[in-house]
Amino acid sequence: MAAAQEADGAGSAVVAAGGGSSGQVTSNGSVGRDPPAETQPQNPPPQPAPNAWQVIKGVLFRIFIIWAISSWFRRGPAPQDQAGPGGAPRVASRNLFPKDTLMNLHVYISEHEHFTDFNATSALFWEQQDLVYGDWTSGENSDGCYEHFAELDIPQSVQQNGSIYIHVYFTKSGFHPDPRQKALYRRLATVHMSRMINKYKRRRFQKTKNLLTGETEADPEMIKRAEDYGPVEVISHWHPNITINIVDDHTPWVKGSVPPPLDQYVKFDAVSGDYYPIIYFNDYWNLQKDYYPINESLASLPLRVSFCPLSLWRWQLYAAQSAKSPWNFLGDELYEQSDEEQDSVKVALLETNPYLLALTIIVSIVHSVFEFLAFKNDIQFWNSRQSLEGLSVRSVFFGVFQSFVVLLYILDNETNFVVQVSVFIGVLIDLWKITKVMDVRLDREHKVAGLLPRPTFQDKSTYVESSTKVYDDMAFRYLSWILFPLLGCYAVYSLLYLEHKGWYSWVLSMLYGFLLTFGFITMTPQLFINYKLKSVAHLPWRMLTYKALNTFIDDLFAFVIKMPVMYRIGCLRDDVVFFIYLYQRWIYRVDPTRVNEFGMSGEAPTAAAPVAEAPPAAGALSSAPSPTTTTEAAREEASTPPPSQAPQGPSSASEPQEAPPKPAEDKKRD
């Protein structure tokens, strides 16, 4: 189930990234003692992987980037005796706009990436005079921020998937950004930055239909576009908010020593060596769900541009968050999924109580430790396991079948490469477990197609000769009475009410959906074996404890971060199964000093086992019995009939004595 849940989360991310919804538009805000190996049995099938945990791992990765950048700043500026290209020492630069510089803001909107038409009044979107560099108290809300809203009349080229750019110029007071106005233009008094404000996103279309009727609920226009442009179409999308930040920073940067990703924003003048004020286009809080496609039905587009000062520390945070993923070589599909994961993080930051969010991040670190320990104990358990008593071997085979179904499903749905690799590794681990629960040999006499050796599978003797196989077969026979009718009902429902690409896709999606919904039932055979054996001594409780704790942490994530209802129900039902394990541990208590039904004990073996004491020989000296021993002996003598008179002699000491009967509690356990 772990791989199934992971692929389900990744698949939904890809579908969501495919199209933008014209939902409600929001304004762009600034947010601001370990048992021996032979006593450890098989664990139940893997639990569903927490999709929310993937989100938290993304947060931790970004925290690491921020820490790395902050660590660089704590080192102080680079030494000034570094040699430059010409052999001259590099010196620290300064900001071309000193503190409290009076400046003007000019914002132009254009279809062209390089803007030159300063005389076109239609291109001028916003002009703000007399701004003070480093002023944090002006503006409508006394926070140094200003904003401007207007409707943009878009040309036909933009309606037909063209690009649109925003060009921002900051000039010192009294100067103009147009280089053709020689008297009013100064190169060192003008800073310019431009950016494409529309965003191209992939919209995927899968041609599906009802396999019985041949009908589909897809939009006819979408079907036509899929026939014209193929299953993947790149469409321009729009978000009406963008923030222009000017960083209030006067750090003596040294050219060539600015660390990434900050180096792409710090621009140096080639002549003076000083750097221009840092302009940053901030769209971090623009959620993907608020983007909508641009088409010919839109004659105008709303645009709200905000201007705010930004501190150096917050700029480092935004730059680290916006840095490109190191996995960009894996394809653009990973970018789209990364955008969706970042949206989950942003929603959690905006909608979750800060204390609860901090607690969640702390617990997530504990989750990662438990996840690693559970995986390590699982591998160690199967690698060192010699006996299969008490283990459900059929559950291992069912896990392999389940992993193969998930792998074929994600391949059929073209999930991104990272998920495919992770699921494939899970399949290899499940296949390796088969070699630990069965004797696998290669028959080189009867080859497949006369070329490849034929693999043969045979049950291990420790499994066949024990009662575990009988109980395992019985458990799966009872389980089939439930699973097969449910599978048939789900197959009929999927065929009647759902759409599919073809019969192959229907089989995979039906099996995949069935495993997601009812796969937890396959955890019950181990419970049944425990019940029939009246023992849990064979279970690896350390690994089960790690998995149980992780499941409870999953519950926290599922209710803190937005998750589908079925995922939350899945976490709850896994909790129920673990509580049943705990209940069995309570009613089938294990005495660590008692040898269980498999001939194993929880105590470490000693060099010499204790033997029954023989009666002392005649004339031998013995110590006086303690009062407790005397009392117990008196009680035993009173509760047993007097033995028949036997001749006393030295030979009686060597006769074997009958072992005392087991207590009633031990009989009940047996």
Swiss-Prot record:
GO CC annotations, alphabetized: endomembrane system; external side of plasma membrane; membrane
Glycosylation sites: N28, N119, N161, N241, N295, N413
PTM-bearing positions, type N-acetylalanine: A2
GO molecular function annotations of the record: GABA receptor binding
Protein's GO biological process: cell differentiation; regulation of T cell differentiation in thymus
Chain ranges on the Cytoplasmic side, renumbered to this chain: 376-390, 438-477, 524-670
Subcellular location: Membrane
Entry keyword set: Acetylation, Developmental protein, Differentiation, Glycoprotein, Membrane, Phosphoprotein, Transmembrane, Transmembrane helix
Extracellular side: 2-354, 412-416, 499-502
Biased composition (Low complexity): 1-16, 609-632, 646-657
InterPro entries: CLPTM1
Membrane topology: Multi-pass membrane protein
Main location: membrane
Transmembrane domains' residue ranges: 355-375, 391-411, 417-437, 478-498, 503-523
Disordered: annotated span: 1-51, 609-670
Modified residues (Phosphoserine): S601
Function (record text): Involved in GABAergic but not glutamatergic transmission. Binds and traps GABAA receptors in the endoplasmic reticulum (ER). Modulates postsynaptic GABAergic transmission, and therefore inhibitory neurotransmission, by reducing the plasma membrane expression of these receptors. Altered GABAergic signaling is one among many causes of cleft palate. Might function as a lipid scramblase, translocating lipids in membranes from one leaflet to the other one.
Family: Belongs to the CLPTM1 family.
Protein name from the UniProt record: Putative lipid scramblase CLPTM1
Native organism: Bos taurus
